[in-house]
Design a protein with these regions (language model features):
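Short alpha-helix in the alpha/beta-hydrolase fold that links the catalytic acid
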Residues: 107-116
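Short, proline-enriched alpha-helix->beta-strand connector loops that line the catalytic pocket
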Residues: 89-95, 118-121
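Acidic catalytic loop of the alpha/beta-hydrolase fold
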Residues: 102-106, 132
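Flexible "cap/lid" loop of the alpha/beta hydrolase fold
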Residues: 3, 7-47
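Catalytic histidine-centered segment of alpha/beta-hydrolase-like enzymes
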Residues: 129-139
Length: 151
């Protein structure tokens, strides 16, 4: 969302962000030619959440709680599932990418590819853990974020 907002601002000749931060996200060019997959069933969607290890198991095992939160989680996932990348020139703002070393869906090369989306500086930092590395390495991430925002 932040990447497309920066591109939208550029098309409108508005100031770009001083720094674009992305976390746990493949570079958008990996979506080139993407065809959105069919909507998963509730059971398939919950199993995908379980594999990402970011939602507590007790939440995923509580039918009443799932009934409340599943629609919002599905909408969030739909934004990504239906995103189609369109080629444009690289941005003129720096990009900093963060990710987890054990993320099964976003490998280091997916993060490194963000460098192709900028004419300015690019940096990347990996933290131990999977897609939700922030849950375990919150302090380390916040220290890196503070450093990057003050450079």
């Amino acid at each position: 969302v932040a990447f497309e907002l920066a591109r939208f601002l550029r098309r409108r000749h508005q100031p770009l962000p001083r720094l674009l931060l992305v976390s746990g996200a493949r570079a958008p060019q990996f979506r080139r030619g993407h065809v959105p997959p069919p909507e998963p069933s509730d059971a398939e969607f919950v199993e995908a959440l379980r594999r990402l290890e970011g939602t507590p198991p007790e939440v995923l095992e509580d039918p009443e709680l799932l009934r409340i939160i599943l629609p919002a989680l599905r909408e969030d996932a739909a934004i990504y599932r239906h995103y189609i990348y369109a080629e444009e020139p690289p941005l003129d703002c720096p990009i900093r990418a963060y990710g987890g070393t054990a993320d099964p869906n976003v490998r280091p090369e997916h993060l490194e590819a963000w460098a192709l989306q900028t004419n300015a500086a690019f940096g990347m930092e990996l933290f131990p853990g999977g897609h939700f590395y922030l849950q375990t390495y919150r302090q380390e991430f916040l220290a890196a974020l503070a450093r990057d925002l003050t450079e």
